[in-house]
From Swiss-Prot:
Na(+) 1 binds at Y98, T101, T102, G361, N365, D367, N450, D454. This is Excitatory amino acid transporter 3. GO terms for molecular function: chloride transmembrane transporter activity; cysteine transmembrane transporter activity; D-aspartate transmembrane transporter activity; glutamate:sodium symporter activity; high-affinity L-glutamate transmembrane transporter activity; identical protein binding; L-aspartate transmembrane transporter activity; L-glutamate transmembrane transporter activity. Residues 313-343, 393-426 dip into the membrane without crossing it. It is found in: Cell membrane; Apical cell membrane; Synapse, Synaptosome; Early endosome membrane. PANTHER family: EXCITATORY AMINO ACID TRANSPORTER 3 (PTHR11958:SF109), SODIUM/DICARBOXYLATE SYMPORTER-RELATED (PTHR11958). Residues 1-18, 83-93, 229-237, 308-312, 344-352, 462-523 are cytoplasmic. It comes from Mus musculus.
């Protein structure tokens, strides 16, 4: 009498282990209800709407705060933990996986939009335009991508990235012209109304972390200090401590997440002015969401099952908190701290894999974005009554794949790359304003698919790299400078005579490939 029942213990254990996920789901529901109630019973000014969403803004700021130290520390320690040959193999496998899934997503999107034909029953004039068209040149965008891979100032790369801007050169006689404004001038001509225009290239910097440049630098830096032996030990220890401290901060931020998400959702519902646009673009949205659902529920799990031979949906359930966060905040980079935590703690993916693969995936693996761009381009062509040739469809496929890889993991990046895709096949770039009104919603779902693709990638790459990781674990020639250096430990069970385990960072790894948390775990 008085003993708790097993079912009661199970419920308490379940609530204790999943309280954050459950509270986040509850926050989403309450946010929707609160947004609908406030929208229906009061008229808020733009200033009131801004103040209402303030708690959600704080959540976004906190998550973005830890992006920089997390990417830098995880990439450097992850690469330094691996032999250069092993890191090369892991990197190649990750890139092949990213490229393959992106191509599959593009093909899936084109097949769906060609089959469903969401734009055939509508015309351009039937849909209200929203916002303005981003001014983007395909050549400038590709060159900026390469420039940002090699930042000229590492400190500046932490808060700015390079972005080219074109300015029209006024004739010498024009008092408004100034042909000597910058030292580097590129003459470009366009024919418009029988007039030749010249443009000059103005180098500018826009706010935002240059994630790609930092990843390239951290990759090289990690390889170098990994080969420095004892001289590099102090740097390895520093970045390991930085990574652990950052994840501790992430745990604190997670406690505030339900409150922030509640006001993010409610604020967005209050902010939307024209709900009629969802009816007009309903078939287009259904096409995009169907493609994202097929890719995330069938394609990615099937790839995971074929390679890993484990239940993919159990793996996806372990990433539930990260997926829900991505759905709410619409940024794969800002979701990265939560993605790390779920992959390493819930799914117990080797930290040497997550630290190397996840930052790269959050930058270049954009399956959802690629699918969306392919669908949107064909949809706009259908609205204009244009029949795309096979060559144009192939061009859309290639451009959407390349543009999604170059897109940064930030909100609304799809619109910028969308202009590139439209320009590649001669479609009017200004028609991107037709879909801006619903982009905020679709952006959340495609971000969730991007994060899910990154997560499955860690599991697949870990399985494919199992042989190399085991060789590092049991190698007799262990590099003591390695941040995941192997130290022999003893097991407190009857198999201690037949098994030998090694401390791998915060994990105990034995030859039976069983992974469990030890008292040295930092999580």
């Amino acid at each position: 009498m008085g003993k708790p029942t097993s079912s009661g213990c199970d419920w308490r254990r379940f609530l204790r282990n999943h309280w954050l996920l459950l509270s986040t789901v509850a926050a989403v529901v309450l946010g929707i209800v609160l947004g609908v109630v406030v929208r229906g019973h009061s008229e808020l000014s733009n200033l009131d709407k801004f103040y209402f969403a303030f708690p959600g803004e704080i959540l976004m700021r906190m998550l973005k705060l830890v992006i920089l130290p997390l990417i830098v520390s995880s990439m450097i320690t992850g690469v330094a933990a691996l032999d250069s040959n092993v890191s090369g193999k892991i990197g190649l496998r990750a890139v092949v996986y990213y490229f393959s899934t992106t191509v599959i997503a593009v093909i899936l999107g084109i097949v769906l939009v060609v089959s469903i034909k969401p734009g055939v029953t509508q015309k351009v004039n039937d849909i209200n335009r929203t916002g303005k068209t981003p001014e983007v040149s395909t050549m400038d965008a590709m060159l900026d991508l390469i420039r940002n891979m090699f930042p000229e100032n590492l400190v500046q790369a932490c808060f700015q990235q390079y972005k080219t801007k074109r300015e029209e050169v006024k004739p010498v006689g024009d008092p408004g012209g100034n042909a000597t404004e910058v030292s580097v001038t590129t003459a470009m001509t366009t024919m418009s109304e029988n007039k030749t225009k010249e443009y000059k290239i103005v180098g500018l910097y826009s706010d935002g972390i240059n994630v790609l440049g930092l990843i390239i630098f951290c990759l090289v830096f990690g390889l170098v200090i990994g080969k420095m032996g004892e001289k590099g030990q102090i740097l390895v220890d520093f970045f390991n401590a930085l990574s652990d401290a950052t994840m501790k901060i992430v745990q604190i931020i997670m406690c505030y997440m339900p409150i922030g998400i509640l006001f993010l959702i409610a604020g967005k519902i209050i902010e939307v002015e024209d709900w009629e646009i969802f009816r007009k673009l309903g078939l287009y949205m259904a096409t995009v969401l169907s493609g994202l659902a097929i890719h995330s529920l069938i394609v990615l799990p099937l790839l995971y099952f074929i390679v890993v031979r484990k239940n993919p949906f159990r793996f996806a359930l372990g990433m539930a908190q990260a997926l829900l966060t991505a759905l709410m905040i619409s940024s794969s980079s800002a979701t990265l701290p939560v993605t790390f935590r779920c992959a390493e703690e819930k799914n117990q993916v080797d930290k040497r894999i997550t630290r190397f693969v996840l930052p790269v995936g959050a930058t270049i693996n954009m399956d959802g974005t690629a699918l969306y761009e392919a669908v949107a381009a064909v949809f706009i062509a259908q609205l204009n009554g244009l029949d795309l040739s096979i060559g144009q469809i192939v061009t859309i496929s290639i451009t959407a794949t390349a543009a999604s890889i170059g897109a940064a993991g930030v909100p609304q990046a799809g619109l910028v790359t969308m202009v590139i895709v439209l320009s590649a096949v001669g479609l009017p770039a200004e028609d991107v304003t037709l879909i801006i009104a619903v982009d905020w919603l679709l952006d959340r779902f495609r971000t969730m698919v991007n994060v899910l693709g990154d997560a499955f990638g860690t599991g697949i790459v870990e399985k494919l790299s199992k042989k190399e990781l085991e060789q590092m674990d049991v190698s007799s020639e262990v590099n003591i400078v390695n941040p995941f250096a192997l130290e022999p430990t003893t097991l407190d069970n009857e198999d201690s005579d037949t098994k030998k385990s090694y401390v791998n960072g915060g994990f105990a790894v034995d030859k039976s490939d069983t992974i469990s948390f030890t008292q040295t775990s930092q999580f």
